[in-house]
Amino acid sequence: MSVDKSPVYNVKAIPVEKIQANDYNPNVVAPPEMKLLELSIWEDGFTMPCVCYYDQEKDNYILVDGYHRYQVLKTSKRIYQRENGLLPVV
């Protein structure tokens, strides 16, 4: 079995401006939990990539999984700066 068959082995750093949230996100996270997620990403970095698919027509990525990590990168100035505005994506 070749390990390059699974997307997890091909993490890419994508500018957050090229990522679009999908229209459907059933999860609602309360502000205290979002603050904890922001703190966790600040202290430990991104430990899981977000899942996206590439839309060739629009030349952007549509977010499938990882909406709250995406939101943290977009809204936390310190994390955005440290990560150079790049989100880990498979």
Regions found by a protein language model. Name each.
Residues D4-V11, F46-V90:
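A short, basic-hydrophobic beta/loop patch
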Residues M1-S40, Y53-K58:
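N-terminal leader or domain-start segments enriched in small/polar residues
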Residues L39-T47:
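Short, basic/hydrophobic alpha-helical segments
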